[in-house]
C-alpha cells in the first residue's frame, strides 16, 4: 500500500473549490481595497493565488490588521485561546461588515 500524503493543501478539495460563476480572477475592488491598522477582516482564501494563501484552518476566521509588510498584511486572529499571526495578501481578505 502507498502512504497517504498530508501536504499543505490536504483535505481542501471542497473548501477551495470555486463555483462556475466565481471562476477566474476576483474583482479589482477586492484587490485595491486599502486596509488600515486596526481594521477587522475576514480570511477568505482565493484558490487562484496559491503561494500567499493561509492554511485552510484559517478559512472564515475574523482577524485584526496589526501591520503591513510590502503588499501583504499582518493579521492577528485566534485559534481557540491562542493568538496567531498570519501574513497574507489582499486577495485572501474581505472587510468585516459585522459589529465591533
Curated annotation (Swiss-Prot):
The positions making up the signal sequence are none
What SUPFAM superfamilies does UniProt report for this protein, alphabetically? Translation proteins SH3-like domain
GO terms for biological process, alphabetical? translation
Keywords attached to this Swiss-Prot or TrEMBL record, sorted alphabetically, are: Ribonucleoprotein, Ribosomal protein
* Record-level Gene Ontology MF annotations: structural constituent of ribosome
InterPro entries, sorted: Ribosomal_eL21, Ribosomal_eL21_arc, Ribosomal_eL21_CS, Ribosomal_eL21_sf, Translation_prot_SH3-like_sf
Listed GO CC annotations: cytosolic large ribosomal subunit
Q: Give the record's family classification.
A: Belongs to the eukaryotic ribosomal protein eL21 family.
Q: What is this protein called?
A: Large ribosomal subunit protein eL21
Gene name of this polypeptide: rpl21e
Amino acid at each position: 500500500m502507498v502512504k497517504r500524503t498530508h501536504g499543505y493543501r490536504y483535505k481542501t478539495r471542497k473548501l477551495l473549490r470555486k463555483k462556475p460563476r466565481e471562476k477566474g480572477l476576483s474583482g479589482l475592488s477586492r484587490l485595491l481595497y486599502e486596509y488600515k491598522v486596526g481594521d477587522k477582516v475576514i480570511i477568505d482564501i482565493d484558490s487562484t493565488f496559491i503561494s500567499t494563501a493561509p492554511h485552510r484552518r484559517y478559512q472564515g476566521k475574523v482577524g485584526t490588521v496589526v501591520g503591513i509588510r510590502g503588499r501583504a498584511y499582518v493579521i492577528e486572529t485566534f485559534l481557540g485561546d491562542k493568538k496567531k499571526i498570519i501574513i497574507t495578501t489582499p486577495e485572501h481578505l474581505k472587510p468585516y461588515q459585522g459589529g465591533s
